[in-house]
Amino acid sequence: MSQPKRIHRICKGLARFTIRATLYGSWVLGLFPFTFDSRKRRLNRSKWLLAYGLVLNLTLLVLSMLPSTDDHNSVKVEVFQRNPLVKQVEELVEVISLITTLVTHLRTFSRSSELVEILNELLVLDKNHFSKLMLSECHTFNRYVIEKGLVIILEIGSSLVLYFGIPNSKIVVYEAVCIYIVQLEVLMVVMHFHLAVIYIYRYLWIINGQLLDMASRLRRGDSVDPDRIQLLLWLYSRLLDLNHRLTAIYDIQVTLFMATLFSVNIIVGHVLVICWINITRFSLLVIFLLFPQALIINFWDLWQGIAFCDLAESTGKKTSMILKLFNDMENMDQETERRVTEFTLFCSHRRLKVCHLGLLDINYEMGFRMIITNILYVVFLVQFDYMNLKFKTD
């Protein structure tokens, strides 16, 4: 029993470290324009941090675009010269990435006043209610936070390996620094949203735990406080509202980020097929290690973002299932029964969903379709460009 407890203790410490590292890193990169008042336990929007973030991020973006070093990559030069379609697709991916970066920064800063209101309300709910209602440690929360931090590290590491690892390439260090700090900033902004979603999941998990505890007590013949059920309903409704507002703030940024991952996977998959067909022209390191690791990490990042949203949605659905346990309780008083009925009706009319742009419900079903579509796009490009896949001998 001591070994699992030790593991959970380590995971809790790692999760706390990841959250703090994200917070301090966001301050340094100018992505979190808020100061924390420890006395009032409130976040305050800082105009100085807003200005610092805009100047820093736009400067880094301009610097990352200034150097003309598209020919630093020997594989890119070889493929571009012999296959114009790959160059056109790669230019399209760069445009999508640029738009994603610009919109991410501008929209995040422009919606910061609304974001600070949401975060402050979550802080109040956590301090006044959820910290007192928690019955046990939420290990899933810790695991997801750790995995998210690990994915960020792997994404940056993967990009650096691609940049510096390809043989016979001209390295421009300051260009790499600017480019990958900009990439890190976008990853961190998306991480802010996913951390908010996983916090909402944890609060829903606490509500479900309270409802299960009440159902167990009723089965044993004990009484429960109807006002506690009313409080849980109010907390549940507040979480749904905050989730909707958070999604509205981040939906464009997260959608564009997913589109960027989607397009990068297409171009990397296409280039990998070309390298495999012309295996004698390229290093085995490139074919078997560099490009495959980039694909795997990108798919993991894409799927993990989907998993965060699906976890919150499925936990909201579990609330309705837990409330059904009260249906066969014979010893409920009328007031408790009325409160449970109100909660059940509310859950039947309103469900927690992470819906981007009012169109995309982010869950496992949608994620599976996205990944299949991603693979089909690569297959389509290979079929469309079939005659140019095999390089002609010089």
From Swiss-Prot:
Belongs to the insect chemoreceptor superfamily. Gustatory receptor (GR) family. Gr22e subfamily. InterPro entries: 7TM_chemorcpt. The gene is Gr22a. The chain crosses the membrane at residues 17-37, 48-68, 149-169, 171-191, 257-277, 282-302, 362-382. Residues 1-16, 69-148, 192-256, 303-361 are cytoplasmic. Its main location: membrane. This is Putative gustatory receptor 22a. GO terms for biological process: monoatomic ion transmembrane transport; sensory perception of taste; signal transduction. Keywords: Cell membrane, Glycoprotein, Membrane, Receptor, Transducer, Transmembrane, Transmembrane helix. It is found in: Cell membrane. Glycans are attached at N44, N278. It comes from Drosophila melanogaster. One of its GO terms (cellular component) is neuronal cell body. Residues 38-47, 170, 278-281, 383-394 are extracellular. Probable gustatory receptor which mediates acceptance or avoidance behavior, depending on its substrates. It is a multi-pass membrane protein. It comes from the Eukaryota. It holds the Pfam family 7tm_7. Expressed in neurons of the terminal external chemosensory organ of larvae. One of its GO terms (molecular function) is ligand-gated monoatomic ion channel activity.
